[in-house]
From Swiss-Prot:
<dbReference type="GO" id="GO:0007283">
    <property type="term" value="P:spermatogenesis"/>
</dbReference>
<keyword id="KW-0813">Transport</keyword>
<feature type="compositionally biased region" description="Polar residues">
    <location>
        <begin position="408"/>
        <end position="422"/>
    </location>
</feature>
<feature type="topological domain" description="Perinuclear space">
    <location>
        <begin position="248"/>
        <end position="273"/>
    </location>
</feature>
<dbReference type="GO" id="GO:0005643">
    <property type="term" value="C:nuclear pore"/>
</dbReference>
<feature type="topological domain" description="Cytoplasmic">
    <location>
        <begin position="93"/>
        <end position="115"/>
    </location>
</feature>
<feature type="topological domain" description="Perinuclear space">
    <location>
        <begin position="47"/>
        <end position="71"/>
    </location>
</feature>
<dbReference type="GO" id="GO:0005737">
    <property type="term" value="C:cytoplasm"/>
</dbReference>
<feature type="topological domain" description="Cytoplasmic">
    <location>
        <begin position="1"/>
        <end position="25"/>
    </location>
</feature>
<keyword id="KW-0653">Protein transport</keyword>
<dbReference type="GO" id="GO:0051292">
    <property type="term" value="P:nuclear pore complex assembly"/>
</dbReference>
<dbReference type="Pfam" id="PF09531">
    <property type="entry name" value="Ndc1_Nup"/>
</dbReference>
<feature type="modified residue" description="Phosphoserine">
    <location>
        <position position="444"/>
    </location>
</feature>
<dbReference type="GO" id="GO:0051664">
    <property type="term" value="P:nuclear pore localization"/>
</dbReference>
<feature type="modified residue" description="Phosphothreonine">
    <location>
        <position position="439"/>
    </location>
</feature>
<dbReference type="GO" id="GO:0007129">
    <property type="term" value="P:homologous chromosome pairing at meiosis"/>
</dbReference>
<feature type="modified residue" description="Phosphothreonine">
    <location>
        <position position="415"/>
    </location>
</feature>
């Protein structure tokens, strides 16, 4: 297993920690990208001057060309391009993929000022690469200005030079390929850093990706050349006329056909060299991108205990419970998962007690953060299902007084911060799924066990029409309680027959009827919405894909998977390694949290489209594993519970838990889940 050695625990700001962890990795990836550049240039020179009938002369000329001073200058220029591309890789990376819910959201993302800057810089860098490639090909495209071939060009000195359209075609194709690379970079989430499931040496990971990189570059360059030829056929006359006018150059149509015609574009030699230039550009940029991903996602070993108390900012418990950059949080959780499985000595540090005092600070900090992450996922699934119960509709109402910001219901469902969660209550189930708390009142027309404040936070404030007998309210009301709890007959009758117009909010305030103006505005808004929904083009951009919203719920599930695996392995190892019994104090909370999350996941996968698997894209250079993270999370959750139950066995019957959780736990003990 390849893991990086850790440095000492040192204090500092989050940016200092980020630089200490990732700084040398970024520099090393850039250095290797530059060192591999001569290999790519040599391959480009060899294939650009291919001559199968004279192979000895072909290879000797290629080697002589590589050692020329001109190529060395281009090597330095291309090294600068690689460094700039690497800087943009570092600036735009993310560990949580961005999943747009509609085509309009994707367009808005592409047109963001940062993305536009990214595209512009890559277009300029692509033009620089194409300029170097055009000169190294030794063909008709070496220079933008060439002598005219016609006799009429000798009338005046200014008319003796003409524009070389081949060179212009090369430059514009490089800019187009650079922009296309940037466009696909965000559309395909290439800035997403997927962490490897199996830890391997960096060389093995790069060697495994090399053949796929070459294949992907060749195919993608072919499509880019096709698209550029189409664009140049329709709009190529615009830059050609502008450059001819700006530089006072003539267009020599006697030397070759214009390239913005079908006959001019059917130049096999030109298309081959442009395609080869695209392969060279994509390979050098993809190498830089792959090396950065390999180095950035390599496992990092955080020390569990600092040598001194004042030097604990980079230690595992402190990093997990602080707010570092997200990639540092991911690396810390990955390290927790690895130490829980493969490092008995570091597990002993987790189970150790502080001296003096005898407190399990390491275990408390680690378990608290893991339980906080799992509770966050439970709340996210709860809120998503509450939104799905109302079909994602937004409601609004008028209340006499504004809603309070610190109600107990809202406080219970806010994302807990690590500093605000000293411990997790042993019966998490009762706060979410207990039937005693699920009695609907007048403030909760949907009859959910969470009160109206949770739904209000998700979907705005409720519309009074849902309580006043609107045509759609009975369907929405009936669907609400079915998500979480089995309601009694009295509850069903109370929900099915809400009071006509008067209701009471959670704060005990009455809700008044909307004004005539408000009703008229609501009706007009519905009419406009219905009118636009019948237009195919508008719905093409505004319609939301259900798979995207489902993927967005689990977009950051990788760290929850590591929290599950790390916590469950530590609990299982504590059965024989925990000499002080520090895990036993939090075992009820851990089991109840896992079982609560298991029930939420089971109910989530009963929703439409949740169980549908997207098509697999095997053999692709772009990682799409984030699309199936929900299935990996469900499998990891069930495996984590089984790991604990098979280790402790019947001893778990003595753990304090609710009746439903005891029943669910017994099913795991009997391997019936």
């Amino acid at each position: 297993m390849a893991t990086a050695a850790s440095g000492p625990c040192a204090g500092g700001s989050p940016r200092d920690i980020l630089w200490r962890v990732l700084g040398w990795r970024i520099v090393t990836s850039v250095v290797w990208s530059v060192l591999l550049l001569p290999v790519c240039i040599t391959a480009f020179i060899v294939f650009s001057s291919i001559d199968l009938f004279h192979p000895i002369q072909w290879l000797s000329d290629s080697l002589n060309e590589f050692y020329s001073s001109q190529v060395i200058f281009y090597l330095l220029l291309l090294a600068v391009v690689i460094i700039i591309i690497s800087i943009f890789n570092v600036e735009f990376y993310t560990v949580v993929p961005s999943i747009p819910g509609s085509r309009l959201a994707l367009i808005a993302r592409i047109l963001h000022p940062q993305q536009l800057t990214h595209s512009f810089i890559h277009a300029v860098m692509g033009m620089a690469v194409a300029w170097c490639a055009a000169i190294m090909t030794k063909g008709q495209s070496r220079s933008l200005v060439v002598p005219c071939t016609g006799t009429e060009s000798l009338d005046s000195p200014a008319a003796q030079t003409c524009m070389n359209e081949y060179h212009l075609f090369f430059l514009l194709s490089g800019a187009f390929m650079g922009y296309s690379y940037s466009l696909l970079y965000f559309i395909n989430n290439m800035n997403y850093l997927p962490f490897p499931i199996i830890q391997q040496y960096k060389f093995l990971r790069f060697r495994r990706s090399l053949l796929l990189l070459v294949k992907h570059s060749c195919v993608e360059s072919l499509f880019m050349v096709r698209n550029f030829c189409i664009v140049y056929y329709f709009f190529g006359h615009i830059p050609k006329a502008w450059i001819s006018t700006a530089l006072d150059l003539r267009t020599d149509e006697q030397a070759h056909r214009p390239l913005d015609t079908i006959g001019g574009l059917l130049n096999v030699s030109l298309l081959y060299h442009v395609w080869l230039c695209g392969v060279f550009l994509l390979m050098t940029w993809y190498i830089s991108w792959i090396l950065f991903k390999i180095y950035a996602t390599e496992a990092y070993m955080f020390p569990v205990q600092p040598p001194f108390a004042e030097e604990s900012d980079e230690c595992l418990p402190k990093v997990l419970n602080s707010n570092p950059p997200l990639i540092i949080k991911y690396l810390a959780l990955q390290d927790l998962m690895l130490l829980s499985q493969y490092s008995p000595s570091r597990r002993q540090e987790v189970f150790s007690l502080s001296q003096p005092g005898g407190h399990p600070h390491n275990w408390t900090a680690i378990s608290r953060e893991c339980l906080s992450l799992l509770n966050d996922m439970t709340q996210k699934l709860v809120l998503y299902q509450e939104a799905a119960a109302t079909n994602g509709r937004m409601y609004s109402s008028y209340s006499v007084e504004p809603k309070r910001l610190s109600s107990p219901e809202e406080t219970a469902f806010q994302t807990p911060k690590p500093s605000q969660m000293p411990s997790v209550p042993p019966l998490v189930k009762t706060s979410l799924f207990s039937p005693k708390l699920s009695t609907p009142d007048g403030s909760s027309p949907f009859g959910t066990p969470f009160g109206s404040s949770v739904v209000n936070r998700m979907a705005g404030i409720f519309d009074v029409n849902t309580c006043c007998g609107s045509p759609q309210s009975p369907q929405l009301v009936r669907r609400g309680p079915r998500l979480w709890t089995h309601t009694s007959d009295q509850q069903v009758s109370a929900v099915s027959n809400p009071s006509p117009c008067a209701s009471v909010t959670a704060e005990g305030k009455t809700v008044r009827q909307p004004s005539v103006l408000y009703s008229w505005i609501q009706n007009k808004r519905e009419q406009i919405k219905n009118f636009l929904s019948k237009r195919v083009l508008i719905m093409y951009f505004f319609s939301k894909h259900p798979e995207a919203s489902i993927q967005a719920v689990f977009s950051d599930a990788q760290m929850h998977i590591w929290a599950l695996e790390g916590l469950s392995h530590l609990v299982a190892a504590s059965f024989t390694e925990d000499r002080f019994g520090v895990v036993q104090t939090t075992l009820p909370a851990i089991l109840n949290t896992l079982l609560t999350l298991q029930e939420a996941v089971d109910k989530y996968f009963k929703l439409p489209h949740a169980s549908s698997k997207p098509p697999r894209t095997s053999g692709s250079l772009v990682d799409t594993s984030y699309k199936t993270l929900r299935f990996a999370f469900r499998a990891s959750l069930k495996t984590a519970i089984y790991r604990i139950t098979t280790t402790f066995g019947e001893h778990l019957n003595a753990v304090q838990a609710s009746a439903e959780h005891q029943k669910r736990l017994q099913q795991f003990l009997e391997f019936k889940e």
